[in-house]
């Protein structure tokens, strides 16, 4: 009852009516009734597959980390009883977010899975190319990036080597170093997407995990995110222009969680409609 005005209110009631035949009002007083109704039908009437089929879904793209084995995608692809395509989508946020506490340990896992010892930018790119080839073999053709904002702080490969070495040694990176690394890593990825004909999807405009007290209690992504307004039009335009200049701008999907960015995105996208 506290969600009126939010799309979640409409979506929730639409799904309850469409799949479970419930036409009432979901609130604290009816929560147990709705819970029991849905669970009874999930036991007897609905399965995950039947819900997918009833929704006329023909393709599902999951969000997958570069180190994922994709074992379930392989099993679904071999299952003749399910004709809905289920394909992986490439989500390398853990490689992008060099400032996060688990970056070094994650890079160790990426090294192991890719078979490449990652110690600098060149070896990181080699490992990423290996994993992208594996994803492509399993049907992937789209990426997904969750950024605070699209940035453009270019730097030399030597500079990025130093930033990676610094972070892998356990040191913190400065904000400028973080932005340089993310810029060059995203440019590298975008050029690879263009080369292998993947679409690049970028969404931004979210300030995550705002409530530290609740984060420590519940962990990340538990309902304490908000709209962010850090995005700058100039950096987005410069990022796309750097790729367009060398004719390496991939098919691109852009959207912000901040509706104030929509007109900016629309006008900037209009400047790059001649890319191959």
Task: Please give the residue ranges for each predicted region.
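Short glycine/proline- and charge-enriched loop/turn segments
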Residues: 215-223
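Metal-cofactor-binding active-site regions of metalloenzymes
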Residues: 1-196, 248-266, 270-276
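Short, basic/hydrophobic alpha-helical segments
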Residues: 239-245
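Histidine-centered catalytic micro-motifs
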Residues: 199-207
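Hard-cation-handling environments
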Residues: 211
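A general structural motif
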Residues: 225-237, 257-264
